[in-house]
Amino acid sequence: MRFNETLEKIKTYEAGKPIELVVREFGIEPQNIIKLASNENPYGTSPKVVDAVREIADTMYMYPDDSMFELKSALAKRFEIDQKNIIIGAGSDQVLEFCARAVLNEKSSVLMSKITFAMYEIYALQQGAKIIRSSCYRHDLEEFYDLYKKHHPDIIHICTPNNPTGDALDAEYLYSFLDNVQEPLVIVDGAYMEYAAFKDEKKRIHPQDLIKKYPNVIYLGTFSKAYGLGGMRVGYGIADQSVIGQLYKLRPPFNITTLSLKAATTALEDEGFVQYSIEQNFLQMERFVNFALQNGFEFIDSYTNFITYLLPENRKSKSLSEALLKRGVIVRDLTGYGMNALRITVGTKEQNDRFFEIFKEVLNEY
């Protein structure tokens, strides 16, 4: 059997370990496991969303509204744009895939940060494209511009706030870069934008401003993080109609379920839940910062719902993450990104209490 030879260059993406896997591997009861690896909203889902989904549960036998009118209307109102500027994906990573398939081929190249969301590379390699990386995990846009002029990439990825590091760009800094980049498709991934904008208004990217001024830019958002809908898989892209029209040619029919559409639409209506989740996140974030300072860890100032601990040479992130896992604490080891670091989702007070207690035990042993 013959497979596409481009697959030989691709590593399988490894998502954060689910609670069920830890139950099977270590025999730990689910209630004794805390998952701080996938940057889900630890406060769950808005009760209004849960009620709305229950109300339509008996319609699951019917295909969803493929026009996605209600959700697009809600997004259009939120961002003061036309519905024709919006495409909905099964998570924003599906929109990423549409972009890669629409633009790239074996003669293409893609520019991204040295350390950033792994799916950018995977989708590019699936199309046979070449990867160009900056020299630093931060988005040094002066270096990005130099690489753009040298290599003329077909897609430029800018993740702000960046995953898995948590740092974010000032909006004006990004706009000054975009002013000088007209040819490639620039993908601005704002999966954690709700958090960044709360912490520092200068970090807020307004997608309506992007599409008015930059027809070659697409902004990505998601309901998986602040809105607490990771299990429903809903994301969106906002761009000039000329871009959205091309991406629609790649969208399969009925790619978003009825329940997911209702959940996302209702989530947009409950800003109180989102605001509460974000406020609590940054209150708890202070504890992670203080813990790092007390234990001599470096960390990256985070504009998200996670923090990245940069560990000293004598402490290996792989060993620490495995030790935590055996005790029922799931965090993300960043060895695969070339970093001796742990990415830790900021949980609830109770989850964090337990994390710090167990992490102290692990640090005393390793």
Swiss-Prot record:
GO terms for biological process: L-histidine biosynthetic process. It catalyses: L-histidinol phosphate + 2-oxoglutarate = 3-(imidazol-4-yl)-2-oxopropyl phosphate + L-glutamate. The gene is hisC. This is Histidinol-phosphate aminotransferase. PANTHER family: HISTIDINOL-PHOSPHATE AMINOTRANSFERASE, HISTIDINOL-PHOSPHATE AMINOTRANSFERASE 2. The keyword Endoplasmic reticulum does not apply. GO terms for molecular function: histidinol-phosphate transaminase activity; pyridoxal phosphate binding. SUPFAM superfamilies: PLP-dependent transferases. The modification N6-(pyridoxal phosphate)lysine is found at K225. It is an enzyme of class 2 (transferase). InterPro entries: Aminotrans_II_pyridoxalP_BS (IPR001917), Aminotransferase_I/II_large (IPR004839), HisP_aminotrans (IPR005861), HistidinolP_aminotransfase (IPR050106), PyrdxlP-dep_Trfase (IPR015424), PyrdxlP-dep_Trfase_major (IPR015421), PyrdxlP-dep_Trfase_small (IPR015422). Homodimer. Its EC number is 2.6.1.9. Pathway: Amino-acid biosynthesis; L-histidine biosynthesis; L-histidine from 5-phospho-alpha-D-ribose 1-diphosphate: step 7/9. Belongs to the class-II pyridoxal-phosphate-dependent aminotransferase family. Histidinol-phosphate aminotransferase subfamily. Its cofactor is pyridoxal 5'-phosphate. HAMAP family: HisC_aminotrans_2 (MF_01023). Keywords: Amino-acid biosynthesis, Aminotransferase, Histidine biosynthesis, Pyridoxal phosphate, Transferase. It holds the Pfam family Aminotran_1_2.
